[in-house]
Design a protein with these regions (language model features):
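A short, well-structured juxtamembrane/interface segment
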Residues: 43-67, 78-80, 85
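A broad, low-specificity signal marking well-ordered, structured residues that form hydrophobic/aromatic
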Residues: 49, 68, 93, 143, ...
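Conserved beta-strand termini and adjacent loop/short-helix elements that scaffold enzyme active sites
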Residues: 54-56, 98, 120-123, 205-207
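Catalytic core of membrane glycerolipid acyltransferases/transacylases, capturing the structured
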Residues: 66-123, 184
């Protein structure tokens, strides 16, 4: 991956100069224990799923020891921790979580599932979150991103993931998930909840760094990535 100093790189300088001491809400450890039964229940639920990944996808997920930027649509995020546990257990994964009070509970829940949390959003502490994500990738850790989260609209691709791919030279892994038996919520994204013991088919698409990305605006590159993932998505 590319070695970049976020303090001096023009694309990150504005983020670095942001007042990054903005308050990040946290909850005491003893309060987070309230979430433990739910975390155990969800882990057991996810363990029953029959996740079928294409043979090439399995090989690349296991073989690639470099940090990856893993892309899910927001409505398919429920299986992200289980997918990583099964196929990239040796690598730590981190997710982007809001710095708000609600985000504090989600970050605590993520930790119980073995997922690290980078606190930030497009509206609050976004610049500092970009820097922290870069540090995680530099340390060899994966990053999982829902480019249309947390508020949508559904299937929108935020330029942030494209900017990270441009500046870190990390491989993007797009995860299109086909659910054979799932409940779909009436939420803004139509969130999927796969039923226990149901089958999920995944054929990951790996997009390696291309030097041409440096000459494409992040928004244009994000739209290109969006079209790629949409073409793989089955609703």
């Amino acid at each position: 991956m590319s070695e970049i100093d976020p303090q001096n790189d023009p694309s990150f300088r504005g983020a670095y100069n942001e007042a990054y001491q903005r308050r990040v809400r946290e909850i005491p450890f003893w309060k987070s224990l309230i979430l433990l039964p739910l975390a155990i229940f969800l882990r057991l639920w996810l363990m029953t799923l029959r996740i079928h990944v294409s043979s090439e996808g399995v090989q690349r997920l296991f073989r690639d020891k470099n940090p990856l930027i893993i892309i899910f649509w927001h409505n398919r995020l429920l299986i992200s921790s289980e997918l990583h546990r099964r196929f990239r257990r040796w690598s730590k994964v981190n997710g982007l979580v809001s710095p708000s009070s609600d985000g504090a509970w989600l970050a605590a829940f993520f930790r119980m599932l073995g997922i690290g949390a980078v606190r930030g959003s497009s509206g609050r502490r976004g610049g500092q979150a970009m820097i922290e994500i870069h540090k995680k990738l530099s340390a060899g850790e994966d990053i999982a991103i829902a480019p249309d989260g947390p508020r949508g609209p559904a299937y929108r691709f935020s330029p942030g993931a494209a900017l990270l791919a441009q500046k870190t030279h990390c491989t993007l892994v797009m995860i299109p998930s086909k659910f054979h038996c799932a409940i779909r919520l009436r939420s803004w994204d139509g969130f999927y909840i796969p039923l226990p013991f149901s089958r999920i088919d995944i054929d990951p698409k790996f997009i390696t760094y291309d030097k041409m990305w440096e000459h494409i605006p992040a928004k244009s590159l994000a739209e290109e990535f969006r079209q790629t993932l949409l073409a793989l998505t089955e609703d």
